[in-house]
Amino acid sequence: MFLIVGLGNPGSKYDNTRHNIGFEVIDNISNEYNIDINRQKFKGVYGEGFIANNKVILLKPTTYMNLSGDSVREVANFYKISNENIIVIYDDISLDIGRLRIREKGSAGGHNGIKSIIANLSTDVFPRIKVGVGQPNDNLVDYVLGKFSKEEKEVLKESIEAATNSVEEIIKQDINSAMNKFNGFKANKSI
């Protein structure tokens, strides 16, 4: 069983913001694999289904970003999911829009959602898919809570699709296969 987590902040005012790209990828996975995200529990909204004949749980924590680990820990403990089978998808300001980076472990890199998950799981060993949202010119908080432009959204469609495909690759094959296949990903469209 796999737990696939998209990080973001709850509420419509955060829709289409850079910090919520994880939620957008989860929504895309939900659509592609016909998994309804309609249950509320574990400090989040979630749904259960199958990808590549493996049972998966799609989770969007509703704790706000900085407390995402509370929700992840509750689901992982309840379903007895090992850390290696927890895939976390989130925004990365160190990557250009249209890029992905997949890692099997590592530090939080300044991302408070990841910091919370590492603290709650007591390990930094869990797969993550970082979706590039570009570098801020000035205020970091304003930038990550800012909305994407129309041009950026066009490029991100490709990133979201690639992130969705990389989740399936991790589940069907393994993290190394996904890293080899997707770490060089660059959207065809650019800004």
Curated annotation (Swiss-Prot):
Its main location: cytoplasm. Pfam families: Pept_tRNA_hydro. It is found in: Cytoplasm. It is an enzyme of class 3 (hydrolase). The record marks 91 as: Stabilizes the basic form of H active site to accept a proton. The keyword Magnesium does not apply. Its EC number is 3.1.1.29. One of its GO terms (biological process) is protein quality control for misfolded or incompletely synthesized proteins. Signal peptide: none annotated. Monomer. This is Peptidyl-tRNA hydrolase.
